[in-house]
Amino acid sequence: MSDLRGLSGQQIVKILCNKLGFAISGRSGSHVRLSKDTPQGKVGTVVPIHSEVKIGTLKGILKLAKINEEEFRKFL
């Protein structure tokens, strides 16, 4: 199983957009807002564009995006 450590913000954005159907909905400084329409409504999250995103921050990003870690790990 791939480790979630050491991912950059840019890598996270690419996975969320290219593999999980999110789209960039805005940018503010070093943060990118992503959103996705689902049958339950709109889901959004914010990803900091840092060279390495800490594991706790990544878990928070995934929680807001309503994606479990196992689903995200499939695309690493």
Model regions: which residues?
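Basic nucleic-acid-binding interfaces
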Residues: M1-L76
